[in-house]
Curated annotation (Swiss-Prot):
The protein's name: UPF0283 membrane protein Ent638_2153
Pfam families the UniProt entry points to: DUF697 (PF05128)
Organism lineage string: Bacteria, Pseudomonadati, Pseudomonadota, Gammaproteobacteria, Enterobacterales
Highest taxon listed in the record's lineage: Bacteria
NCBIfam families tied to this protein: hyp_HI0043
Length: 349
């Protein structure tokens, strides 16, 4: 026997239709757009190196504020007024044949000319410092570019700015490794792996030497005032050497911008007794027990000098860091500890 048919069941409402995902239509890029195409890069996570790292980076980075623009505009108007008044005085002195006033106007014109020349020189140096940031952005774009024709000229400009001679072995190896079929990304990557490490190694040596000198000097100096003066002098000298190494000449106002960072470093030179308290994490029990207070302060000042050098190196470097190229503070810390161990081992018991 067959079972009877079940009655129908009526469901309220309408059936849900499957939702098809809407995709954007294909977009064809023209020649210039294809050359400038670069994949989107997600925002990097904030660095967890602490507030001291932020202070160092803020002091090294060139910045423009509204107050600075207002002061610049006021000084410009004042300078124009002074020049106009000077021209009027000169004309009056010439018409009345007042030779004393005319000589004073000539002396004032010489002083104003010297001042304008100095300001122009400082502005050019500040502009060059800001241009280095734009060059890093351009290099970052070239690292993602698959076009050709721009990478070689860009790298040759960087080598010329750094003062690298055409006969330098590293530059000759780079010329031998590149060819016309390579993209800008490949050419700049080869420059970053062959030529740029030559300058980076020199900057690392400068940082290591300055940090070691700061450590040893503070460890043996009995006067806090001498420590502060030595730290200030060594840090300014380190910044100048790193900037000159990468082809940047710092001016007077650039040094003033870094002066508060130097003051911060000097203040830490007097408060680096904390290194003694965390010394067990860095060194063995035996070495931490043999460290004196002055030696611990020297290690703290040396580490802060190394941190300052790393940030100055990052600012003056024309290429962004790749992979693990960025120097780590721990590397300099191990060097300082090794030098301190050697010094303590040579010290008569």
């Amino acid at each position: 026997m067959t079972e009877p048919l079940k009655p129908r069941i009526d469901f309220p409402g309408t059936l849900e239709q499957e939702r098809a995902e809407a995709f954007k239509a294909a977009q064809a890029f023209s020649g210039p757009q294809a050359e400038n195409f670069a994949p989107a890069v997600a925002e990097e996570l904030l660095s967890d190196e602490g507030p001291a790292e932020a202070v160092v980076e803020a002091a090294l980075r060139p910045k423009r504020s509204l107050w600075r623009k207002m002061v610049t505009a006021g000084l410009t108007l004042f300078g124009i007024s002074v020049v106009g008044q000077g021209v009027q005085w000169t004309m009056n002195a010439w018409q009345t044949q007042d030779w004393v006033a005319l000589g004073g106007c000539a002396a004032g014109a010489l002083i104003i000319g010297a001042g304008v020349g100095s300001v122009a020189t400082e502005w050019r140096r500040l502009w060059r410092l800001r241009q280095r940031a734009h060059e890093r952005d351009e290099a970052r774009d070239l690292f993602h570019s698959h076009a050709t024709g721009k990478g070689r000229a860009f790298c040759e400009k960087l080598a010329s700015q750094a003062g690298i001679d055409q006969s330098h072995p590293a530059l000759q190896r780079w010329y031998a490794a590149i060819h016309e079929t390579q993209s800008d990304r490949e050419i700049v990557s080869l420059y970053a792996s062959i030529v740029q490490p030559v300058l980076d190694s020199q900057a690392r040596r400068e940082i290591s030497r300055s940090a070691a000198e700061s450590t040893l000097m503070i460890a043996v100096s009995p006067l806090a005032l001498v420590d502060m003066a030595f730290i200030a002098w060594r840090n300014l000298r380190l910044i100048n050497r790193i900037a000159r190494l990468y082809g940047i000449e710092l001016g007077y106002y650039s040094r003033l911008r870094l002066f508060r960072l130097v003051l911060l470093n000097m203040a830490f030179a007097g408060a680096s007794e904390l290194v003694r308290e965390v010394g067990m994490d860095w060194m063995s029990q035996d070495l931490a027990a043999r460290l004196s207070t002055r030696a611990a302060q020297g290690i703290g000042a040396g580490l802060l000098t190394a941190r300052l050098g790393i940030k100055a190196m990052e600012l003056c470097r024309p290429l962004p860091w790749l992979n693990d190229d960025k120097p780590r503070l721990g590397d300099f810390r191990r060097e300082l500890i090794g030098q301190l161990k050697e010094t303590l081992s040579k010290k008569p018991q």
